[in-house]
UniProtKB/Swiss-Prot annotation:
Pfam families in the record: Ribosomal_S20p (PF01649)
Descriptive protein name: Small ribosomal subunit protein bS20
Gene: rpsT
Organism: Deinococcus radiodurans (strain ATCC 13939 / DSM 20539 / JCM 16871 / CCUG 27074 / LMG 4051 / NBRC 15346 / NCIMB 9279 / VKM B-1422 / R1)
Function: Binds directly to 16S ribosomal RNA.
Region Disordered: start-end pairs: 1-25, 68-92
SUPFAM superfamilies to which the protein is assigned, alphabetical: Ribosomal protein S20
A GO cellular component annotation in the UniProt record: small ribosomal subunit
Similarity comment: family membership: Belongs to the bacterial ribosomal protein bS20 family.
UniProt GO BP: translation
Length: 92
């Protein structure tokens, strides 16, 4: 980082803040996705609500450009597929 340029110092500070915020959002998405999947595998009734919460967080991250829109769609699709598979296994 260039120590002589105030604007470069400020941009660096801002990038560190954004990185922390983005990492926290991605971590929350992973946590809620895992909780939804575990709930579906365990046959919990609130698995659908957890899935909706995870998908909402994914959409918000994509809206704020933390995630690319295609990456968000892929995560939602894979989560739904895994949860549906777990629910089908519970019923069988």
């Amino acid at each position: 980082m260039a120590l002589r340029h105030k604007s470069a110092q400020k941009r660096h500070r801002q990038s560190l803040k954004r990185r922390a915020i983005n990492r926290a959002k991605k971590s929350t998405i992973k946590t809620f996705s895992k909780k939804a999947l575990v709930a579906a595998q365990g046959g919990a009734e609130d698995a659908t609500a957890m899935q909706q919460r995870a998908e909402s967080l994914i959409d918000k991250a994509a809206k704020g450009s933390t995630l690319h829109k295609n990456a968000a769609a892929r995560k939602k699709s894979r989560l739904a597929k895994a949860i549906n598979k777990a629910k089908a296994a519970q019923q069988a």
